[in-house]
Amino acid sequence: MQLSWKDIPTVAPANDMLDIVLNRTQRKTPTVIRPGFKITRIRAFYMRKVKFTAEGFEEKFDDILKGFPNINDVHPFHRDLMDTLYEKNHYKISLAAVSRAKTLVEQVSRDYTRLLKFGQSLFQCKQLKRAALGRMATIVKKLKDPLVYLEQVRQHLGRLPSIDPNTRTLLICGYPNVGKSSFLRCITKSDVEVQPYAFTTKSLYVGHFDYKYLRFQAIDTPGILDRPTEEMNNIEMQSIYAIAHLRSCVMYFMDLSEQCGFSVEAQVKLFHSIKPLFANKSVMVVINKTDIIRPEDLDEERAKLLQTVTELPGVEIMSASCQLEDNVMNVRNKACEKLLASRIENKLKSQARITNVLNKIHVAKPQARDDVERTPYIPEEFKKLKKYDPEDPERRLLARDIEAENGGAGVFNINLKDKYILDDDEWKNDIMPEIMDGKNVYDFLDPDIAAKLQALEEEEERLEKEGFYDSDEDESYGGFDQEEIDEIREKADWIRNKQKKMIAEARNKKSLRNKAMMPRSKLVKSFGDMEKHMATLGHDMSSLQDKHRAAAEKSRYVETGADVVFGQNDSMASGSNGGKLRQSDRLLDGVADGSMRSKADRMAKLQRRQRNRDARQGEADRHATASLPKHLFSGKRGIGKSDFR
């Protein structure tokens, strides 16, 4: 349930709303259209204008209708409060006018869009667009007064305090200037204006405080005058509606000193006149300003008037002084206790809730099977035990007694392992590891582990004596002879080597996945590799070896006499080296030494710098790029986009 309305969007005046929506249409829709364009494009241009403007008005109206609360859906307290402050009928008529304007704008947009579909020229479409926007503007201008009223309501709603009608509430009421605001300032941290004249509080003020870890709200209401409800103003009606609708403890304040300007008789009369509003509520009468006069100091006539209030059932009277802060917190605590008790009582009276809870509860009670009385059994040994007495010198010493005898806590540490029950008392203080070899030691503990180990050892000795583990020499290899075993081992070695090669080949392929790979047809393959591969497969390569040798002898070069002569001439011509001339580096042929070479490199680098800055492809690149690209620096706004201007 919504308790405050501080997030309602601002309601713009009619003229401002027109400027906002029309400027938005001008900024966010295309602006260029020419008579030479296709008629379908012209129609779409102006239809977009009309629809976009209508959507802008509809969004504004939707924000208003959704932001303001529906007066029929809120709590009765808020409904009556809004009726008092803003006049319910005026509020409904204003929102209805906005809703009607939204419907009319939608209808205008729909009608003129239908007409624009049949426009014959640019001028005709433009005039239809002007007519549509003009009618929308006329509709919005008629909302001038409702929009101004709704903006004032929005501002006032945002300043209203957040009052929860269902939480624990103390409601402070009474005549003006009897000390209601002073009491609220004393029990809460709210900064309420306090003045020595009447009608200082003109609206509801809320303060919060904690009592017994529960959150309470205290509401200070404007002063009420003793007159008919029809004659009360809006300020007084706020108090009446708060008393009528809020589930609270009503604290009726009285000023017996009559400094508030109203007599005790008038204050008692007001209490009796608003008494019907106290139905189903806890009521407390608070006598304020006891620093001036106390109830005991009243004369007999006024004491009888006050007694007519206290004699009513369920009404409790207390006194306090907000000026001296005397008994203020006691009054507050008493009111809180009274409110909590009444809330619990109301919950218990609601039969529906109790019925729902009782349907879920079943109390199971055991039924007696016979009439035999079965008393609890206590062994005789326990009955004979002597009762522990700390003053008895022969008592059994407890651990704390031993600790006290040896210096007390912090000096003497009690041995917690002293009561362990083990086979050997020397084992009590042994260190027991929790983790050993990465395993939990307690998972392998067994009380009978020694007996089980001894039984296993005896069984092993018996099996060895019986020859259970002895085996014949023929059966040592599973019935295979030595030759078969050697053959199996050779095959196993071959399989292992083959697996290693396959793994190595797979790794090589994986490493070359993103690198350049030599084609299979270009790989150099020797006859020796093929011979080894075929031998591993079990093929006889003797015939292929003979053919390979014969082919190699035929291809071998045989020197003749002419070859010898040419060879000698070549060796003489090449000098003492007798080999081929090395090819020189053409980049360094024209450079004398290292210093000249570094200077040449530096000059070449300087020449490349400007070319790189201009992004030239080389020395011959003389292309002149456009300094002002025409497609970026010419033209106007197109449909749906704009240029760089």
UniProtKB/Swiss-Prot annotation:
Keyword presence, Isomerase: no
Name listed for the protein in its UniProt record: Nucleolar GTP-binding protein 1
Alphabetical UniProt keywords? GTP-binding, Nucleotide-binding, Nucleus, Ribosome biogenesis
Taxonomic lineage from the root: Eukaryota, Fungi, Dikarya, Ascomycota, Saccharomycotina
GO BP, one annotated term: assembly of large subunit precursor of preribosome
Q: Where is the OBG-type G domain?
A: 168-340
PANTHER family recorded: NUCLEOLAR GTP-BINDING PROTEIN 1 (PTHR45759)
Sites binding GTP sit at 174-181, 220-224, 288-291
Q: What does this protein do?
A: Involved in the biogenesis of the 60S ribosomal subunit.
Write out the transmembrane intervals: none
Tell me the Pfam families matching this sequence. NOG1, NOG1_N, NOGCT
Coarse class of the primary localization is nucleus
Q: Which organism is it from?
A: Candida glabrata (strain ATCC 2001 / BCRC 20586 / JCM 3761 / NBRC 0622 / NRRL Y-65 / CBS 138)
**GO CC field:** cytoplasm; nucleolus; preribosome, large subunit precursor
- Which family is annotated? Belongs to the TRAFAC class OBG-HflX-like GTPase superfamily. OBG GTPase family. NOG subfamily.
Q: Where is this region: Disordered?
A: 567-645
Q: Where in the cell is it found?
A: Nucleus, Nucleolus
